[in-house]
Amino acid sequence: MAKTMIGVIGGSGLYEIDGLENATWQTVETPWGPPSDAILTGMLAGVPMAFLPRHGRGHVHTPSSVPYRANIDALKRLGVTDVISVSACGSFREDMAPGDFVILDQYIDRTFAREKSFFGPGCVGHVSVAHPTCPRLSGACESAARDAGITVHMGGTYLAMEGPQFSTVAESKLYREAFGCDVIGMTGMPEAKLAREAELCYASIAMITDYDSWHPHHGEVDISDIIATLSGNADKGRNMVRRLPALLGAERAPCPHGCDRALEFAILTAPDQRDPALVARLDAVAGRVLG
């Protein structure tokens, strides 16, 4: 049976977890360039962990400049099997209030300035992202959040915007009323798509910080309010993460939903027509099927 290794992508506060043993910052090189930062690895309750600050320590990357491909490749290269994404989001629903967590299960991708696939000319691949998150891993996150006393909502649709500016009132109302989205953020895509291409189980937790700009009784998004809410959410996030090793266990069976076999029939380019340079770059992401 395979071994579990949990990867967490999120803010800098998440990796300051009591009980993380043998903590070491590792620099990981990838064919897609450097990841956002070095990756903190260690053991938590007997399970290997890897923490990657999405924007880098000190928040140096914009949502558009985050090296999403390098981040996912680096985690896969380290042996991560299960990726937990944690990010700040605005809410389109009254009942999803600031301080609440939402376990996402769907996305609408409105980003336009990011590389969204590991594949390309010379090695064409098409994976299904009909269900972009892993129900097994999402269920574990829900249990961990409830055990930590967090108000958590299971299921929600995330509107991924390019940023870095926040929405206009008209955009906010469009996404809420016409699109039927539940939350909005700037970093959920293409991260979820790339995790699927890398055959990683992926769960995403939206930490609600505000009501975006649609709400008639709340003002426009204020970054100072977001930072204040994030401070409290970081404590909740750490309490959730520290419960995950016990829920997932050190031994890992194949994903019942097929996340770890997403590339089984996805690559269409004939073997004799594949670009050797691109195939070499895919060694960690798709080595299982490319040989």
Regions found by a protein language model. Name each.
Residues M189-S224:
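Zn-dependent metallopeptidase/amidohydrolase metal-coordination segment
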Residues A262-G291:
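Acidic, Ser/Thr-rich low-complexity intrinsically disordered segments
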Residues R136, A140-T151, N239-L247:
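Generic non-transmembrane alpha-helical segments
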Residues A144-D182:
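Active-site/ligand-binding-proximal alpha/beta "capping" segment
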Residues M1-H131, G287-G291:
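Metabolite-binding pocket within alpha/beta catalytic cores that recognizes anionic/polar moieties
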Residues K76-G79, R176-E177, R196:
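Non-catalytic positions within long, well-ordered alpha-helices that form the structural scaffold/packing
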Residues S213-R261:
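His/Asp/Glu-rich mid-to-C-terminal helical/loop segments that flank catalytic regions of hydrolases
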